[in-house]
UniProtKB/Swiss-Prot annotation:
Organismal lineage: Bacteria, Bacillati, Bacillota, Bacilli, Bacillales
GO biological process: nucleotide-excision repair; pyrimidine dimer repair; response to UV
Family statement: Belongs to the uve1/UvsE family.
Keywords, sorted A to Z: DNA damage, DNA excision, DNA repair, Endonuclease, Hydrolase, Nuclease
Function: Component in a DNA repair pathway. Removal of UV LIGHT damaged nucleotides. Recognizes pyrimidine dimers and cleave a phosphodiester bond immediately 5' to the lesion.
One of the record's GO molecular function terms: endonuclease activity
HAMAP family in UniProt: UV_endonuclease (MF_00606)
PANTHER family: UV-DAMAGE ENDONUCLEASE
Enzyme Commission (EC) number: 3.-.-.-
Protein name: UV DNA damage endonuclease
NCBIfam families: uvde (TIGR00629)
Length: 317
């Protein structure tokens, strides 16, 4: 069983390398037309250049997974902001794409919790489609839209989870088919359990990104031993291995909050279930210390008898 690792957005080991610098709309409004254009251009350019630095760091450390920052283009989906963020940066998008393709990196996006399809308010669904379209356009500009995924949660229950799930199935029909084809769903820590998310994924033929921390915070009746093989099966129509999210609780009191690093004892039960299936899968680390937490966790895992480190960020068990 091969386990490959990655992390989210910011490389903590790199100095001054945020790929998510932004500008608020309030600040944006105070600028002249030319100043607005210059500011958007400068911030986006810096984010793209920082992303390139991070990709070089990932390549040097043999880190095969990476989640791009959704904030790579500031105010990209704001209705009052017009900005050709694709055409203005074609060489940089292509440079990012060339690095990803040459080194066979697995890239993803994870829009925020407001991108959902369970609301009964049409504008919420419209905004979700706008946001998904933005993420797809960025992947397309990079040249990896047909091989990369945009991950979201099912969405809020709005007082009636059953009705909300019904709305998801209706509202998702409004998302263009080529974008839906590149989306994944994740179980959340308060609303849709692992079993409920699995059922939705099976019905919609959407790959399921399993989050173990969320699962433990929002348990369902079905045991993980039954769920995980079916979760992995949702990836069978793709040409890539399943991906899971790993983090551990900040504390017992703040169980849903992510800790700085990974608590191996918290994760061990999941790993033992996965080992019984013996299916290759990828792991996205969601700890606060990102790449540093990932590398520490890999080091800890590799010290366990039977687990072999076969590259900087890949283990064999």
């Amino acid at each position: 069983m091969i386990m490959r690792f990655g992390y989210v957005s910011h490389a903590m080991a790199l100095w001054d390398c945020s790929p998510a610098k932004t500008i608020t709309f309030t600040s944006f409004q105070k600028l002249s037309k030319q100043e607005r254009e210059d500011k958007l251009y400068d911030v986006t350019k810096q984010n793209l250049e920082h992303t390139i630095r991070i990709l070089h760091y990932n390549i040097a450390h043999e880190i095969p997974l990476y989640r791009l920052s959704s904030s790579i283009v500031p105010l990209a989906t704001h209705p009052e902001v017009e900005f050709d963020y694709i055409g203005a940066f074609t060489p940089l998008w292509r440079k990012i794409g060339a690095l990803i393709k040459e080194h066979n990196l697995r890239i993803s996006f994870h829009p925020n919790q407001f991108t959902l399809f369970t609301s009964d308010k049409p504008h919420i669904t419209t905004n979700a489609i706008t946001d998904m379209t933005y993420h797809y356009k960025v992947l397309d500009a990079i040249g990896i839209a047909d091989s990369s995924y945009i991950n979201i949660h099912v969405g809020g229950a709005y007082g009636n989870k059953e009705k909300a799930i019904e709305r998801f199935h209706e509202n998702i029909k409004k998302l263009p088919a080529h974008i839906k084809k590149q989306m994944t769903l994740e179980n959340d820590d308060k609303t849709c359990t692992t079993a409920e998310t699995l059922s939705i994924c099976q019905k919609e033929k959407i790959p399921f990104v399993f989050d173990y921390h969320h699962h433990m915070a929002n348990l369902c009746e079905e045991p993980l031993e039954e769920l995980l093989p079916a979760i992995f099966e949702t990836w069978s129509h793709t040409n890539i291995v399943p991906k899971v999210h790993i983090s551990s609780p900040k504390s017992k009191k703040e169980f849903r909050a992510h800790a700085e690093y990974i608590d191996l004892e918290f994760i061990k039960p999941f790993l033992h279930v996965a080992k019984k299936i013996n299916h290759n899968f990828d792991i996205m680390i969601e700890s606060k210390q990102k790449d540093l937490a990932m590398l520490q966790f890999i080091q800890e895992l590799s010290s366990i008898r039977g687990i072999k480190r076969i590259s900087s960020s890949t283990l064999q068990w």
